[in-house]
Amino acid sequence: MKDQIVFKFPDKSFYYEEDFCVGENNYEAYKLIKEWPNWSFKGINIYGPKKSGKSYLTKIFSDKAKSKIFDSKNINKNNLDLILSQNVLIIEDIDFFSDEVFFQTILNDFISKNKFIYLTSNKLSGSISFKLKDLISRLNSLVTVAIT
């Protein structure tokens, strides 16, 4: 054999909306993402167990909103300007946010500018063991959608 044929397969890190499988366990969240930016609210928390499709839905939303996805474990003062420059705040895994004051500061900035907020977590945002009452209040004001 003189020439080897090389097949180029797509990168597995790509999430294509047309490949997303909508079912009763994620229908409500998917429907809300499709309706954005015509929401009657400014913030959402999509929560559910690991491997339930939160990251896939978040990628679909991020593409639609043209905003960057931030992982709560990687958010710090070094990327604050980039975070605040987004049209929509998209943070995954807020359960693991270690600096509550910093998190609240970011949320307050987006709320004061009437920008959209999209958060994911493993459990309902209001039931995460945060200590700051104002942060808990902000999180409790979000629309929440469970996926399984």
What kind of region is each of these model predictions?
Residues S62-K73:
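Post-Walker A helix-loop "phosphate-sensing" segment adjacent to the P-loop in P-loop NTPases
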Residues M1-E35, S40:
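A short, basic N-terminal segment
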Residues L82-I106, K113-N122:
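Conserved P-loop NTPase "ATPase switch" module shared by AAA+ and STAND
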Residues F20, A29, I46, F110, ...:
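Conserved RecA-like P-loop NTPase ATPase core
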Residues L57, F61, F102-K113, D134-R138:
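Catalytic-core regions built around general acid/base machinery
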Residues S125-N140:
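Short regulatory helix/loop adjacent to the ATP-binding pocket of P-loop NTPases
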Residues L142-T148:
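Conserved AAA+ ATPase "SRH/arginine-finger" region at the nucleotide-binding site
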Residues F41-T58:
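Walker A/P-loop nucleotide-binding motif
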